[in-house]
Amino acid sequence: MSNSIVIIGSGFAARQLVKNIRKQDASIPLTLIAADSMDEYNKPDLSHVISQGQRADDLTRQTAGEFAEQFNLRLFPHTWVTDIDAEAHVVKSQNNQWQYDKLVLATGASAFVPPVPGRELMLTLNSQQEYRACETQLRDARRVLIVGGGLIGSELAMDFCRAGKAVTLIDNAASILASLMPPEVSSRLQHRLTEMGVHLLLKSQLQGLEKTDSGILATLECQRCIEVDAVIAATGLRPETALARRAGLTINRGVCVDSYLQTSNADIYALGDCAEINGQVLPFLQPIQLSAMVLAKNLLGNNTPLKLPAMLVKIKTPELPLHLAGETQRQDLRWQINTERQGMVARGVDDADQLRAFVVSEDRMKEAFGLLKTLPM
């Protein structure tokens, strides 16, 4: 059994792991190291802070000190880990080092910012810390450009619109949520955003940004320009892999782990947004919760593989919320779409008429759990 566990990170994945370890072992030494304050907040709330008038500090649910006391932890906030000596089992920062028996990387993912001229003018909303840095600018902004029409971009577009701001959403795809579902399924939400006043610029690409006396000038294709007060990058996340790479671990899109959450080094594990589990990056709450339960057991001497069921993904767009599950991005599915006033049920079936995916909206979201049971594992 491990004598000491060091966790790098303090987000949802790290906290779920701590809670699951402490359910089974109240005394094993646990050390958490992170670059942020280590205060707890609910990250999905960032998609709704503007319409709800919340400040960054309003999001805090539990301070780092309260967390440490509740779960008997050693915490090192505002600490940048610079290196991992995997052979010596040592984690290093500029001024400190920690010995470990088992190490867990829960370093999360960072928001991708498109590499265009003026990219430094783009804001990101991937953490409480990032929101704190730009909350005044976002609150005061009348005109907002959101770059990226995926899950987060669609949520933010609706939220800023509900807050009374003039919102433009740009994406190079022909429809919103293009990486998650086909246009015939996402069209209901797309129409709702348009009805609310969101200006959609699809099949368009941002060319550059420039600061002006009255705001930010965004140049699009064909030399078209629009002026806004704030630009938000919502073009996806990139797993944080730099530390793992320096430690000599196997990296692909994320830190590669097997069904036991173990990396290419037997005493180092990865969890959450930074992990690539058997080739899959799963930056959603449910797989992280299930992964944390399994990893806690394995760190305490068990040998339990992770088995993920079909899981719901929730798109938090309050005027037209969606739940989806299964292989919604598959190109070969045939979609059977039933639309009523109270909502939509879209079923994606394969050539054998086997249900492989579904999307439900509004009041018909209550049908999700029944459909979930019929999806293949």
From Swiss-Prot:
The reply to whether Flavoprotein figures as a keyword in the UniProt entry is: yes
Q: What is its EC number?
A: 1.18.1.-
Record's catalysed reaction(s): 2 reduced [nitric oxide reductase rubredoxin domain] + NAD(+) + H(+) = 2 oxidized [nitric oxide reductase rubredoxin domain] + NADH
Localization of this protein: Cytoplasm
This protein's pathway: Nitrogen metabolism; nitric oxide reduction
Disulfide pairs here are none
Provide the top EC class: oxidoreductase
Is Isomerase one of the keywords UniProt gives this record?
no
Q: Which domain of life is it from?
A: Bacteria
Q: Which UniProt keywords apply?
A: Cytoplasm, FAD, Flavoprotein, NAD, Oxidoreductase
Q: Name one GO cellular component term.
A: cytoplasm
Which cofactor does the UniProt annotation name?
FAD
* Coiled-coil annotated spans: none
* Any GO MF annotation of the entry: oxidoreductase activity, acting on iron-sulfur proteins as donors, NAD or NADP as acceptor
Q: What is its main location?
A: cytoplasm
- Function recorded in the entry: One of at least two accessory proteins for anaerobic nitric oxide (NO) reductase. Reduces the rubredoxin moiety of NO reductase.
PANTHER family in the cross-refs: NITRITE REDUCTASE [NAD(P)H] (PTHR43429:SF3), PYRIDINE NUCLEOTIDE-DISULFIDE OXIDOREDUCTASE DOMAIN-CONTAINING (PTHR43429)
Family per record: Belongs to the FAD-dependent oxidoreductase family.
Write down what this protein is called.
Nitric oxide reductase FlRd-NAD(+) reductase
Species of origin reads Escherichia coli (strain SMS-3-5 / SECEC)
